[in-house]
Amino acid sequence: MVPETGLAPETGSSGTVAAVVPAAGSGERLAAGIPKAFCEIDGASMLARAVAGLLDSKVVDHVVVAVPADRVDEAKRLLPGQATVVAGGADRTASVRLALAAVPGNPAFVLVHDAARALTPPALIARVVQALRDGHRAVVPALPLHDTVKAVDANGVVLGTPERDGLRAVQTPQGFATDLLLRAYAAGAGTAGFTDDASLVEHVGGQVQVVDGDPLAFKITTQLDLLLAETIVRR
């Protein structure tokens, strides 16, 4: 069944772009005492900075954010008129579904962006959208890995060392043809184990294209990440 959403299951003909930002998580690893998306970086919340980056890219027509139910009014005060605020769900997937349901019209493409990647440059967002317009139906920004990666078992015993050349660290926003994203969410309903939206698309056989990421699109997860973000903003 197609997810409960305001979007039609066909790709929109208008060429417009919507972005959804699931921001209802608690952010326990950041240990800030408030939902992570509402933590401030030099006076502006991560959520406000993430939404501003999307709109400053000039390629996003509307943004829908999903926040904790008790933070909806606060988010509405923080965000501009081009952003719609809805109450999020129990997990990220549920929040994306609720945000999709509130997307107006029938956009051709949908971006899914992490509020915690608050410093993502507008140029990166434009790069993802351009790849969609060039004909790719699923696009993720990513960076090469510089550290050696080990596969380990439950006891910490190394099972192998994957070749770094074929590995990438994936960022957001991840972009999709609207019909493909809806189909992926419909097929993945009730299925656990997907860590990003591109994984859902891969699950239904969709091909995902990688474009160059950006170091500034790092995910703010710990206090050290937050300190780095504040240092960058204040420089």
Swiss-Prot record:
Any one biological process term the GO annotation gives: isopentenyl diphosphate biosynthetic process, methylerythritol 4-phosphate pathway
Keyword terms, alphabetized: Isoprene biosynthesis, Nucleotidyltransferase, Transferase
GO MF: 2-C-methyl-D-erythritol 4-phosphate cytidylyltransferase activity
Pathway(s) per entry: Isoprenoid biosynthesis; isopentenyl diphosphate biosynthesis via DXP pathway; isopentenyl diphosphate from 1-deoxy-D-xylulose 5-phosphate: step 2/6
EC number: 2.7.7.60
Reactions performed catalytically: 2-C-methyl-D-erythritol 4-phosphate + CTP + H(+) = 4-CDP-2-C-methyl-D-erythritol + diphosphate
PROSITE patterns documented for this protein: ISPD
Keyword hit for Nucleotidyltransferase: yes
Pfam families, per database record: IspD
Physiological role: Catalyzes the formation of 4-diphosphocytidyl-2-C-methyl-D-erythritol from CTP and 2-C-methyl-D-erythritol 4-phosphate (MEP).
Protein name as catalogued: 2-C-methyl-D-erythritol 4-phosphate cytidylyltransferase
Primary gene name: ispD
